[in-house]
């Protein structure tokens, strides 16, 4: 506990909040170009082949982003929109690719939770 005299001499240090998505530089989303599209396995106790992509963002960062939903049309040089949001069982994956915008197609035959997967309302 500092004395009054110590507080007069120097103020209390402000606790700075550390961002969980530094590559976005404070923006809600960023555009990027896929440099590699591949699958990876989650950590224990889960088992799957998760679809991820290495993306070079306009902010200059190269990040690993998760491709949500069933099936995708992404390949190298695809232009994608990246948002924040980690994948709990994939270490180092702190971003998601937004479906249904730029080069990323929406999920086929999706009827529930459509807005999260870039699917228009079926006629």
UniProtKB/Swiss-Prot annotation:
Q: Which domain of life is it from?
A: Eukaryota
Q: Name one GO biological process term.
A: translation
| Subcellular location per the Swiss-Prot or TrEMBL entry | Plastid, Chloroplast
A GO molecular function term, named singly, is: rRNA binding
Q: What is its main location?
A: plastid
Tell me one Pfam family matched here. Ribosom_S12_S23
Can the keyword Chloroplast be found in this entry's annotation?
yes
Descriptive protein name: Small ribosomal subunit protein uS12c
Q: What phylogenetic lineage does the species belong to?
A: Eukaryota, Viridiplantae, Streptophyta, Chlorokybophyceae, Chlorokybales
């Amino acid at each position: 506990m500092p004395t009054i005299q110590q507080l007069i001499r120097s103020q209390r240090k402000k606790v700075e909040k550390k961002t969980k998505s530094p590559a976005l530089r404070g923006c809600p989303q960023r555009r990027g170009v896929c440099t590699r599209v591949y699958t990876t396995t989650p950590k224990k106790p889960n088992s799957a082949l998760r679809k991820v992509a290495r993306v070079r963002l306009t902010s200059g960062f190269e990040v690993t982003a998760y491709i949500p939903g069933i099936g995708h049309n992404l390949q190298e040089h695809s232009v994608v929109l990246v948002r924040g949001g980690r994948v709990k069982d994939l270490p180092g994956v702190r971003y998601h690719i937004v479906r249904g915008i730029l080069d990323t197609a929406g999920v086929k035959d999706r009827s529930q939770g459509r807005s999260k997967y870039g699917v228009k309302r079926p006629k």
